[in-house]
Amino acid sequence: MAIVKCKPTSPGRRHVVKVVNSDLHKGKPYAPLLEKKSKSGGRNNNGRITVRHIGGGNKQHYRLIDFKRTKDGIPAKVERLEYDPNRSANIALVLYADGERRYIIAPKGVSAGDMIQSGEDAAIKVGNTLPMRNIPVGSTVHCVELKPGKGAQLARSAGAYAQIIARTGTYVTLRLRSGEMRKVLSECRATLGEVGNSEHMLRELGKAGASRWRGIRPTVRGVVMNPVDHPHGGGEGRTSGGRHPVSPWGVPTKGYKTRSNKRTDKYIVRSRNKK
C-alpha cells in the first residue's frame, strides 16, 4: 500500500493525496452479495431535509457484509480484497469449504490465499473470530459484538481496533481507540487483529468535486446565514455570531454533553473524555 501525492498539473490535482493498494481486485464485485442502495438526498418521507450535507454522488451498490461470522468450524480461503464505497475499510471475499462465499471486513495483514476460521476452537490468528472468553488478555481485536449473536458493532472502520485488558467473571474489559474502557460480555465475538487500510486517514480529496462524487454537499457557516436560518445569522456586516457556538437548533456545539443513554452507563468503566 502506497501514499501517492499527485503532481500539480491542475488546480484540482495540486492537493490530492491518494492511497494506492495494488492488492485490491480490479474487476466487478461478487454480484450475489450486492443489494440496491437508494439515495434519499437527506430527505424524509415528507420531502424535507432531515440530514444536512447529503445529496448527489455516484451510484453505489451495498455489499452484504458478514458481521456475525457464524459458520463455525468451516475453514475459509480469502479469494481477494476489494474496495467498498460504503465504508473506509476494505473488504475481503472469502470462500468457505462448503462452497459459500461471504464478504468480511479485511483485517490488517490478511491477503489473498490466506485461510481463516471462526468458532470456539479457532486458532489465535489474525482474521479468526472467537468468543472473547477464548481470546488471551492483551490481544488486539476488531469487529466486536456488544450483544451475543447480534453482529459486530465496535471497531469496524479503517485502522480501528480494541484491546482486551482484563477478564472478570462473565465480562471482559476493552480499551477502545477513543480512550474509553468498556465492559462487554465475554460470550460476544471479536475478530483477532486490527482493521486494514489504516492509511485511509492520510488521504486528501484535494477538491470540492471529490466530495460531491461521494454524495457530500457543502457545509455553510451559521454566521453567513440569515437570522431565520441559524441562531448565528444576521447582523450588519461581518459579525462573530454574538453568542457561544450553537447548532442550527440552538444546542451548544463545543464540549456540550449530549449522551443520554443512561441504561448502558454501567458498562463504561472509564469515559473517553477523562484525561
Swiss-Prot record:
A Pfam family per the record: Ribosomal_L2_C
Gene Ontology molecular function, alphabetical: rRNA binding; structural constituent of ribosome; transferase activity
InterPro entries with a match to the protein in the record: NA-bd_OB-fold, Rib_uL2_dom2, Ribosomal_uL2, Ribosomal_uL2_bac/org-type, Ribosomal_uL2_C, Ribosomal_uL2_CS, Ribosomal_uL2_dom3, Ribosomal_uL2_RNA-bd_dom
Keyword terms of this UniProt record: Ribonucleoprotein, Ribosomal protein, RNA-binding, rRNA-binding
One GO BP annotation of this record: cytoplasmic translation
Source superkingdom: Bacteria
UniProt GO cellular component terms: large ribosomal subunit
Record flagged with keyword RNA-binding: yes
Stretch list, region Disordered: 28-48, 223-275
Similarity-based family: Belongs to the universal ribosomal protein uL2 family.
Subunit structure, as described in the record: Part of the 50S ribosomal subunit. Forms a bridge to the 30S subunit in the 70S ribosome.
Function description: One of the primary rRNA binding proteins. Required for association of the 30S and 50S subunits to form the 70S ribosome, for tRNA binding and peptide bond formation. It has been suggested to have peptidyltransferase activity; this is somewhat controversial. Makes several contacts with the 16S rRNA in the 70S ribosome.
Protein name, as recorded: Large ribosomal subunit protein uL2
